[in-house]
Amino acid sequence: HCISSAASDVYKRQHLADTNFFRSLKRKPVIINTSRGEVIETGALLEALDNKSISDAIIDVWEHEPEINLELLRKVIIGTPHIAGYSADGKANATRMSLDAICRFFRIERNYEIHAPVPNSPVIHAENYENALLQIYNPAEDSDRLKNQPELFETLRGAVSYTHLRAHET
């Protein structure tokens, strides 16, 4: 079982997953946070990991980042340096949103299109879907880098690369 956060900007988002939330869980899910760091209360998540009310946690966004909780980083199965927005799609969307806001502010007609670059098509040799996905991107590699050098959170965040794809290109 898995619970993944995808909090909207419309609703209350601070500490949606707090001590009461974790204590109310009937099963022991894996918790995944890729939305906003403040959605999950760090202390409550640590308590849930310690008392085994959840199976594990995967965290990409951290409460109080870039000052991340090192104890939590050590305890999660995968912890990455808020890399979700660093994909080509994420950068294209952020650029489009910025240009939209500038055009609205200056009352400029929006007559442009922004597209994410077309990704390379890697050749993947795998016996199953899991191995195929790990050839494209293995989050454990970024997790290991962050766990080994948490003080480089911002540097690692900007340095996420997909160079391993190039090894599989035709």
Where are these regions (language model features)?
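Rossmann-like dinucleotide-binding domain for NAD(H)/NADP(H)
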Residues: K28-E169
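A short, aliphatic-rich alpha-helical micro-motif
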Residues: S4, F22-L25, L72-L73
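Rossmann-fold NAD(P) dinucleotide-binding segment
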Residues: K12-V30
